[in-house]
């Protein structure tokens, strides 16, 4: 569950194992049971997620996210996070004009290790096959979603898509988050009361 670390994998620590680490996002179950993506870094910031290898570091070249493995054998949970991850990658490929099927665009941690740009870690190669999936089927799913989502470019320059970073019942908490978001460079951020 996002915000909870019952599996002792230590992402929720300041410096797990003495290392400073941070992925760009987590995908997992919320307290209400739904699956969501929780962004922890702006997409254009360098993360500290994959380590390095003999040919450099995936941290310098890739956006990363961690899929919380709440239930390695729970098919419903797997399908929900797999779908969420595919939708996230679809959005990122669209945003950055990337071909999900191009070599090295979407890789698992273990594939980064094989390329010499990441530490030796199995994700998601140990989990996807348990549910009949692979990184190849994942990339194909992203390509399918990307093709389905392609729509004619709007000529209306005033159409905006907004991204919400939180919902708070205490105004002081909303003010604190707004301050953090603006400090991170998002100067047009604002609070909307509803």
Regions found by a protein language model. Give the residues of each.
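Solvent-exposed beta-strand motifs enriched in subsets of small alpha/beta binding domains
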Residues: 151-194
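A short pocket-lining beta-strand/turn micro-motif at the edge of beta-sheets
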Residues: 61-63, 104, 159-161
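Short glycine-rich loop/turn motifs that provide flexible caps or phosphate-binding loops at active sites
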Residues: 2, 107, 165
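Basic/polar, cationic surfaces and motifs that engage anionic cell-wall
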Residues: 68-157, 194
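Gly/Ser/Thr-rich beta-alpha loop segments that engage phosphate groups in nucleotides
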Residues: 5, 110, 168
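Active-site-adjacent loop/helix surface patches within enzyme catalytic domains
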Residues: 1-99
